[in-house]
Amino acid sequence: MAGNKVAASLAPQDTDTCLRELEHLAARIGLAEVRLDLMASFDVDKLVAASPVPLVLTCRPERERGGFTGPEPERLAVLRAAYDAGAAYIDVETGSLDEVAGWDGSPTRIIASQHWYDTMPADLPEIYLALRDRCDVVKLVGTAHAAADVLPVLELLDKATTPVIGMAMGDPGTCTRLLAPVFPQTLLTYGAIAATHLTAPGQITIDEMTYRYALGAVGPQTSVYLHVTTSDRGDRDVLDRQDRAARGTELHVSLRTTPDDAPALAARMADALPAITVRSA
């Protein structure tokens, strides 16, 4: 999937505020997720009609750590309104896929999402296979507590044959957000509009994605390097490499681990990700 895969994740107060933020961000993003469940009020039809970029509309229930606390039929009605309005995508939890299976008459595509807030399943590629025929896009998000936890996400992105969103929450997972655009089937990678507006742990800002990492310019011509680091100095060296790289020609990303674990982790990453040059710093 070509084009700018950087997506803003927004949780504004109301529709007009959201549209102003989208106008401000439009030149730096390819899509935007709008968290309807975190808004005080919203007009779905106006959002879809006036947005300068394609929208992913989400209404996450409280049981999935979202902000919607009303009855399930009411939440599904919000998603149906977004679907009928012609939003580019709606994000539907995997447990609710049966509820939307019969919807038609709209170009809106369905993202089936599943989150693990405390762990990282080792079998993300297998979970993807079980879901891919039930939706247009599979979104699988786990939590990384250690550097090795990001491997299932990167394997998922590498092996996917249909549109996919995959990332690891938590500080070790930041590298998955930066590497995601490298993989052909990746639909998007989320960024925050500012460091004070993070919507998930491990997020980085759109400005950093755009100006430091040039993710909007990443493509087949980009040489990609994953540096397994063991110190602050190693991390700084990787940032220096990225800052010196010409836009879109090289992507340098660090993954921090312990000195004892670094050689084995780098070997595992290199074996699993042949398209990426893995180095142990």
Locate the predicted segments by residue.
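Active-site beta->alpha loop and helix N-cap motifs at the rims of alpha/beta catalytic domains
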Residues: 2-122, 130, 134, 142
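Short coil/turn connectors at secondary-structure junctions
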Residues: 2-5, 52-53, 106-107, 161-162, ...
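Structural motif
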Residues: 16-17, 124, 148-149, 259-266
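Conserved strand-to-helix beginnings and helix N-cap segments that scaffold or border functional pockets
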Residues: 19, 44-45, 124-125, 150-154, ...
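Short, surface-exposed connector motifs at secondary-structure boundaries
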Residues: 26-31, 82-89, 132-139, 157-164, ...
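General beta-strand structural signal in soluble alpha/beta enzymes
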Residues: 57, 91-92, 112, 166, ...
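Catalytic alpha/beta core domains of metabolic enzymes, predominantly
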Residues: 95-227, 231-234, 244
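N-terminal ligand-binding/catalytic initiation module
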Residues: 219, 223-281
